[in-house]
Regions:
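Structured, non-membrane catalytic/scaffold regions adjacent to prosthetic-group chemistry
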Residues: 29-233
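N-terminal secretory signal peptides and thylakoid transit peptides that target proteins
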Residues: 1-19
Length: 233
């Protein structure tokens, strides 16, 4: 993987921004529901786990022999795996180009199956100690998918929504990195439901909250997205 100095600086900046924000987006702010202080007060810092990265901000890659299991599971539906279609060959994912891609509609596996397949052994690490694990992901690069649906240069951002209504908004510079994949295999087997079947976004140089599980919708935009829906209760 080779990147120009300019690309490296741009990517490293966006990666670090995502690392610092991941813990905030992964759970409601601790201050919500508490009385609002009249001024700024000292608060306790969260202990964040270490995420192994290369000097250029990309994820450290491991050998196939180092692949193992993921310990721990996290869902927004009271930590219960949402019901849904877990078979990647039967999946139907909504794609909305919002005027920034030439194709919109329903993404099915036959579209992904025609794209080059890639595998990476990388660390999945939550901001907390768990979930975590060094595992092998197999799928297609997000950049190849974006090209397949005709995402234009002015498609600056992407929103991905999971089956538990959790979502991430990500800049396209990050998603076009060659390590970012739409994966349907974990350690050479279909991703199990608890870890994000049928299709999961893998952003290995960000904390695990950014690797969205069980994708149900993908949107592109040039500017901004509508306000999110409330979390399921």
């Amino acid at each position: 993987m080779r990147m120009s100095r300019r690309e490296t600086m741009q990517f490293s900046a966006t990666a670090l921004a995502g690392l610092s924000l991941a813990s905030l987006e992964a759970e409601p702010l601790a201050a919500q529901g508490a009385p609002q202080p009249d001024g700024l007060v000292e608060t306790k810092l969260r202990q964040i786990s270490t995420l192994p990265l290369n000097p250029d901000g990309s994820a450290v890659e491991y050998t196939p022999q180092e692949a193992g299991a993921i310990t721990g599971v996290l869902w927004r539906t009271k930590n219960k795996t949402p019901e849904g279609e877990y078979d990647v060959r039967k999946m139907k994912i909504k794609v909305d180009g919002r005027g920034t891609a030439t194709l919109s509609g329903t993404l099915t596996f036959d579209v992904l199956e025609k794209l080059p397949r890639h595998s990476y052994v990388v660390r999945l690490q939550c901001g907390a100690p768990n979930p975590r694990g060094t595992v092998k992901w197999t799928g297609v690069r997000f950049s190849d998918f974006a090209q397949a649906v005709g995402a234009q240069s002015f498609a600056n951002y992407c929103r991905l929504v999971g089956s538990d209504a959790y979502f991430i908004d990500e800049d396209m510079t990050t998603l076009m990195h060659p390590q970012v994949v739409l994966a349907w295999q974990l350690n050479d087997a279909p991703i199990p439901p608890e870890h994000g079947a049928p299709l999961r976004l893998i952003v290995p140089f960000r904390y695990g909250a950014r690797s969205l599980k069980a994708i149900t919708e993908i949107q592109f935009t040039a500017t901004s997205f509508a306000p999110p829906k409330p979390w399921p209760t």
